[in-house]
Amino acid sequence: MAKEQIKVSEVKRTRQKGGAVVTVDEFLSLKRPKGDLILKVGREQVSVTSLDRIYWPEEKLTKFDLLSFYLHVADYIMPFLQDRPAILQRYPRGIKAPMFFQQDLDSAPEFIKTARLTNQEGRQLDYGVYSTTASLLHFVTLGTIEQHPWH
């Protein structure tokens, strides 16, 4: 299946939300942070929000814990995700709350690459593409717990 880059104007580009800018090492050294931060990953800055949101109630694991996990495994999983469009299975309120699938991106930061593809129903959709660790973390901060790349 051929993919083509879509025009920037097709996907609304968003600005980073407020918060202190921290490096990956500073982020990983935090103990139970609350609120929002901007995480500097390579050349990109990823807005990470609601870090204290509980994703797994029984274990009391938060969005911060999930982002930390993905930072630790990014070097191992990015080769398998690299340059593939993302089908986002989002749990924005944690695993006990309703989830939904998102394929068609309506907005994204400038550093998120996009691809316009035709889905199984014949509709053209604008997918976010896993291109860097920053893109992976952006999808995670949207509530994407599992990663589902388009094959």
Per-region residue spans from a language model:
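Intrinsically disordered, low-complexity regulatory tails
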Residues: 1-36, 40
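Active-site loop/lid in soluble adenylation, ligation, and acyl-transfer enzymes
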Residues: 29-31, 35-39, 44-151
